[in-house]
A protein has these predicted regions:
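Short, well-structured N-terminal submotif of metal-dependent ribonuclease cores
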Residues: 1-39, 53-68, 110, 119-123
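Short, basic/glycine-rich phosphate-binding loops at helix/coil junctions
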Residues: 3, 46, 84
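Acidic active-site catalytic centers that drive phospho-/nucleotidyl reactions
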Residues: 8, 46, 100, 118
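Active-site neighborhoods of divalent-metal-dependent phosphate/nucleic-acid chemistry enzymes
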Residues: 59-67, 71-117
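Generic structural signal for small/hydrophobic residues in well-ordered secondary structure
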Residues: 8-10, 47, 88, 107
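Active-site regions of enzymes building and remodeling cell-envelope glycoconjugates
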Residues: 125-130
Length: 130
């Protein structure tokens, strides 16, 4: 069912060369032209950090790979806002990962379904699709 989706960092990484790691139903939904799919600046930041720490092998540095791939998929950028940052104070402290917590707040603020394999997201008041 087409809708508005926000990609967690993991599926964003998977779609950059490990597409088979994303379930077929998820790939189909994201490819539906009626679906609006966002990626967050937060994920770009997380990918860059992991790459610099040597924890994320890529064919080239993220600044060269990501813009090309994001354009290929037609995903839209969701900027980090002050409202999202301050929204962290209203989020239960179930999970400590700052990137994930900001993505949860962004999904709530935009009414987006969060696309993620991370089961901990189910403990938050956000809809998750995987």
């Amino acid at each position: 069912m087409p809708g508005t989706y926000l990609l967690d960092t993991a599926p964003l990484i998977y779609l950059m060369g490990q597409e088979d790691s994303v379930p077929v139903a998820v790939r189909r939904e994201l490819a539906d032209p009626r679906s609006e799919v966002f990626y967050s600046q937060i994920s770009l930041w997380e990918i860059q950090i992991k790459y610099q720490l040597g924890k994320l092998p890529m064919s080239d540095e993220p600044a060269l790979v990501l813009p090309r791939e994001l354009d290929r998929y037609g995903f839209r950028k969701l900027d980090l806002t002050d409202t999202a940052i301050f929204g962290l104070s209203r989020l239960p402290s179930v999970h400590r990962d700052p990137f994930d917590r900001l993505l949860i707040v962004q999904a709530k603020l935009t009414g987006s379904v969060l696309v993620s394999p991370d089961k901990i997201f189910a403990q938050y008041p956000v809809t998750v699709f995987w």
